[in-house]
């Protein structure tokens, strides 16, 4: 009879990773790293877009607020043209003019205590896809005075203004052609409707009452 085979009392030694196991582990690590980077990149892009959207919202809100404030503080004060021969109406706007809107407004802040009027002449024009706001440093400018120009709104496709007269009729031009002198130099509309179409925001409508 053959003697029984004695089993080793020592446990089997741990085997090392095989080449296939190492490749699988590396593949899993690579996939997890790629997923982690993709998630991080997506989060960065999302945060960047959110910041851009917020900045755009602030730009549009600021531009509209300036426009509405100018209209709300319009006053009946015509100005002399640069040559001093004629007067421009205190409020004018509409298609077919050099500027979309031009008016005299009150409330020009003077924190520096300069010797100037608190009335200000401002105008708006659509230049390319930008609405520009301009103002003169003096109320009755001469040919040597240069306006201060600011890009107020960008990405603009179109802008339309409508003016409500005292008879509750809407006009696309102000002063209305039927309004005789000198009334046309001093009369302001009761309200102004602003329709602006943006490339990214679509159409925005604002209605503002002009100071009485």
PLM region spans:
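Short solvent-exposed loop/turn micro-motifs enriched in small/polar/acidic residues
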Residues: 115-117, 143-144, 154, 187-189
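Extracytoplasmic beta-strand-rich oligomerization domains located immediately C-terminal to a leader/signal peptide
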Residues: 35-142
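Structured surface patches comprising rigid loops and adjacent beta-strands/short helices at the edges
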Residues: 77-80, 151-163
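Short linear sequence signals and composition-biased patches located at protein termini or domain-edge surfaces
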Residues: 157-212
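Short, mixed charged/polar active-site loops
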Residues: 117-121, 147-149, 202-205
């Amino acid at each position: 009879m053959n003697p029984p085979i004695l089993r080793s009392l020592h446990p089997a030694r741990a085997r090392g990773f095989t080449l296939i196991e190492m490749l699988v582990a590396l593949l899993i690590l690579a996939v997890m790293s790629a997923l982690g980077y993709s998630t991080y990149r997506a989060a960065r892009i999302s945060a960047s877009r959110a910041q851009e959207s917020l900045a755009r919202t602030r730009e549009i809100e600021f531009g509209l607020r300036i426009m509405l404030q100018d209209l709300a503080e319009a006053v009946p004060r015509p100005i002399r043209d640069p040559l001093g021969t004629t007067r421009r109406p205190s409020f004018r706007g509409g298609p077919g003019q050099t500027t979309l809107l031009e008016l005299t407004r009150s409330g020009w802040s003077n924190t520096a205590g300069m010797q100037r009027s608190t009335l200000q002449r401002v105008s708006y024009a659509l230049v390319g896809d930008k609405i520009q706001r301009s103002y003169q440093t003096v109320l009755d400018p001469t040919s040597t005075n240069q306006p201060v120009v600011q890009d107020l709104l960008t990405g603009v496709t179109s802008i339309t203004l409508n003016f409500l007269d005292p008879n509750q009729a809407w006009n696309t031009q102000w002063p209305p052609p039927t309004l005789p002198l000198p009334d046309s130099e001093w009369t302001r509309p009761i309200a102004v409707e602003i329709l602006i179409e943006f490339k990214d925001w679509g159409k925005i409508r604002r209605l503002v009452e002009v100071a009485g």
